[in-house]
Amino acid sequence: MTIATKVNTNKKDLDTIKVPELPSVAAVKAAIPEHCFVKDPLTSISYLIKDYVLLAGLYFAVPYIEHYLGWIGLLGWYWAMGIVGSALFCVGHDCGHGSFSDYEWLNDLCGHLAHAPILAPFWPWQKSHRQHHQYTSHVEKDKGHPWVTEEDYNNRTAIEKYFAVIPISGWLRWNPIYTIVGLPDGSHFWPWSRLFETTEDRVKCAVSGVACAICAYIAFVLCDYSVYTFVKYYYIPLLFQGLILVIITYLQHQNEDIEVYEADEWGFVRGQTQTIDRHWGFGLDNIMHNITNGHVAHHFFFTKIPHYHLLEATPAIKKALEPLKDTQYGYKREVNYNWFFKYLHYNVTLDYLTHKAKGVLQYRSGVEAAKAKKAQ
């Protein structure tokens, strides 16, 4: 069956899925040790400092890496910068959610210190990302990676349909496509983009944008005003950081079996249960503050649990979801040492969502696989 095969989605013929009783957020929270909800500012700041030290170490090492290992070493350095840059982003990510500390001023300050150097406008990102957590797996309201329905897909141009299939697209999706150009949620740098509705939002956008511009200018000065050096040692590492971030966020919510819901079927807990913990291995999960393999816990309590408590909270959440383990709503975890190739594979095979039941969508390939299995 080809990528353009149309799946029959006549809504009148769709069954209604009977949803088992799902635990409340309060019930899940009660299963987690209380200290997991404690936000220690000093601990949080220590991770911010740690990531800066790692980045400084990589910059100190790059002349030697390039001298002894040439372009192959430089390519490896770019990947390392992408990983550590994403770790720094994750600290700012805690700041944006308020899980960094109980002090809003400290969260905002450290959030800008973490995000501005990697050209991620803190307050605009905070605004768009919040809606992703509030409406996870909602076909219309979820933000970040847009859900593509069969109708959306059929109305796209060839470039729009197959851009994601091109491997190099991953390096461009975060910066410049998402944050600067503003696809699909609106530019995070332009105060009058559709992302912002109030004067306060626009002022915050301008402040965060200026912070990014200052960091970029400082980098340009440190590069001795050389565009070539600036691109080679500052902007290209940021493209790798954007790639890693895109892969992290994509894999956390994508596989053939996950469900996406229309408004009448969506619920907060039901949506969060479609999140997937992915273990990358090789120490990468730890470097990136367990945002990869502790993401289910983060999604349930994104404003309450700091990243350094996610792994301890995860077994408790798994236990709370244990009665649902044989359903669509159980705890989900995969080991993905092949995370980069998994990402590339999904971009080819997961093209669009189609209805599997009334108000419930699934990727076309998953629906077809289920039908083929049922027909056997």
Curated annotation (Swiss-Prot):
GO molecular function, one term: oxidoreductase activity
EC number per UniProt: 1.14.19.-, 1.14.19.6
CDD domains on file: Delta12-FADS-like
Source organism, top-level taxon: Eukaryota
Transmembrane residue ranges: 45-65, 69-89, 203-223, 228-248
Topology of the protein relative to the lipid bilayer: Multi-pass membrane protein
UniProtKB keywords: Fatty acid biosynthesis, Fatty acid metabolism, Lipid biosynthesis, Lipid metabolism, Membrane, Oxidoreductase, Transmembrane, Transmembrane helix
Disruption phenotype: The fat-2(wa17) mutant leads to high levels of C18:1n-9 and low levels of PUFAs.
GO biological process, one term: innate immune response
GO CC, one annotated term: membrane
Enzyme class of the recorded protein, top EC level: oxidoreductase
Annotated metabolic or biological route of this protein: Lipid metabolism; polyunsaturated fatty acid biosynthesis
Role this protein plays: Can function as a Delta(12)/Delta(15) bifunctional desaturase and behaves as a nu +3' desaturase. Introduces a double bond in the fatty acid chain three carbons away from an existing double bond to biosynthesize polyunsaturated fatty acids (PUFAs) endogenously (PUFAs are essential for membrane structure and many cellular and physiological processes).
Further comment found in the protein's record: HPO-19 and T05H4.4 are cytochrome b5 reductases required for PUFA desaturation in Caenorhabditis elegans. HPO-19 knockdown or mutation alters FAT-2 desaturase activity. Although FAT-2 lacks a cytochrome b5 domain, its N-terminal contains a DUF3474 domain that may possess some oxidoreductase activity for electron transfer, obviating the need for an extra cytochrome b5 enzyme, but still requiring cytochrome b5 reductase HPO-19/T05H4.4 to become activated.
Family named by the database record: Belongs to the fatty acid desaturase type 1 family.
Name of the protein in question: Delta(12) fatty acid desaturase fat-2
Protein source organism: Caenorhabditis elegans
